[in-house]
Amino acid sequence: MSDNKVNLPLRNGVGIVVLNKDNKVFVAKRIDNQKNFWQMPQGGVDKGEDYLTAAYRELEEETSIKNVELIKECDGLISYELPKNLLGIIWKGKYRGQEQKWFIMRFLGQDNEIDIKTKHPEFSEWKWIDLENITDLVVDFKLHVYKDVKEKVKEILN
C-alpha cells in the first residue's frame, strides 16, 4: 500500500439510481457505518466487465433487485476521493477513490422483492426517499457526486 494518495489509482465503479413507480429513490444504510449515512447502490467494475453489466450485477448483489429497466446511462464519469482516514482501509489500500459511471433505472417489481440480507450484506436497512433528499443523507466525500446525479435525474423526470 502506498501512503502517497496521488500515486494510487481511482477504482472503476458504477452507481445506480433506482426509481420506483412514484419516482422515489432507493437508498440503503451501510452496515459498516455507525453514523446515519445512506447511499444508492454502487460498486466496482470487475476485470473485463462493461459498466452496464457491472451495474446490474452490483444492484442484484447488494439488494437482490433484478426487475428493473434501464432509463438512462448518464454521460461521462464522476469521481470522488477518499478522505485520508479511509485510505489504506477501503479496497485494501489499492485505490484513492472511485471513478463512476451512473445509470438511472426503474424498479418494476414489488418492495418484497428487495432483500439486503444477501450473501455478503453491505446494508442494514433501506427505504424510498424523495429525490430532493438524496444529498441530505450521504457521506461528505460523496456529496458532489450525489448533487451531480440528482441533477441528471431531474433532467429525466422533467
UniProtKB/Swiss-Prot annotation:
The keyword Hydrolase applies. SUPFAM superfamilies: Nudix. Its cofactor is a divalent metal cation. Keywords: Hydrolase. It comes from the Bacteria. GO terms for molecular function: bis(5'-adenosyl)-pentaphosphatase activity; guanosine-3',5'-bis(diphosphate) 3'-diphosphatase activity. It is an enzyme of class 3 (hydrolase). The keyword Hydrolase applies. One of its GO terms (biological process) is ribose phosphate metabolic process. Residues 9-151 form the Nudix hydrolase domain. A motif (Nudix box) lies at residues 43-64. Its EC number is 3.6.1.-. Belongs to the Nudix hydrolase family. RppH subfamily. Accelerates the degradation of transcripts by removing pyrophosphate from the 5'-end of triphosphorylated RNA, leading to a more labile monophosphorylated state that can stimulate subsequent ribonuclease cleavage. NCBIfam families: PRK00714.1-3, PRK00714.1-5. This is RNA pyrophosphohydrolase. It comes from Pelagibacter ubique (strain HTCC1062). The lineage of its organism: Bacteria, Pseudomonadati, Pseudomonadota, Alphaproteobacteria, Candidatus Pelagibacterales.
